[in-house]
Amino acid sequence: MGDCFENILRTASSLKLREPVIDTVIRFSEDMCRWLLHLHLKLGTDIEVITVGGNHDTQRLLESRPTFEDENLTKFVVAYMKQRYEGIIGVDINDYQDIAIKNIRGTNIMFCHGEDKDLSTTMDYFSNLYNVDIDEGYGGHLHRPESKAIGITEVGDRMFTRVGSIVGIDTFAKKIRVAARPSVYVALYTDNGKTWGRNYYL
């Protein structure tokens, strides 16, 4: 869901960095490759990897605002994973995207970073842009998990789920007065749609 890295978004960001950003990108890319291989072998099933960028991954090269949103460090992660998994059967690395829409067991799911305030409008926009009915959406950005019903579909309520952050609370979270433990979200889909979902706290 993006925000793989702290990056240097503002001067205060440099206080949080434990190593150069590029070194973090390389280490994170390798860690993801090892984790995906372990997951693939442990579950004994094929894995499709969908990666979208976030605002923290964007390079702010000339100004304080991320005017060059295509300058995203997550593209390096995707390129690295594609290189590592080239020719390996069972792990499919999708191209980098700012948003992705995938059909999982008959449910059309949108994956985005989630920085928009009105996520219902975001889902409607991309439904119209790509001419596909989006049943559910996933995003992050706010560093806390929450789910919201924003309509109905053939497979049930049209839900948007914000997933938590593996970082948990940071200075931005404190500034906007939100707090949540570091977490990841896992969901199970069958032909009847999403049948199970859970936050795992780290």
Show which residues each predicted segment covers.
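Conserved beta-sheet core of the metallophosphoesterase superfamily
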Residues: 71, 75, 81-86, 95-96, ...
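Acidic carboxylate-rich catalytic motifs and surrounding loops in phosphoryl-/glycosyl-chemistry enzymes
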Residues: 47-55, 91-100
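Active-site beta-strand termini and strand-to-loop segments that position acidic
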Residues: 102-106
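Core catalytic region of metal-dependent phosphoesterases/phosphodiesterases
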Residues: 1-81
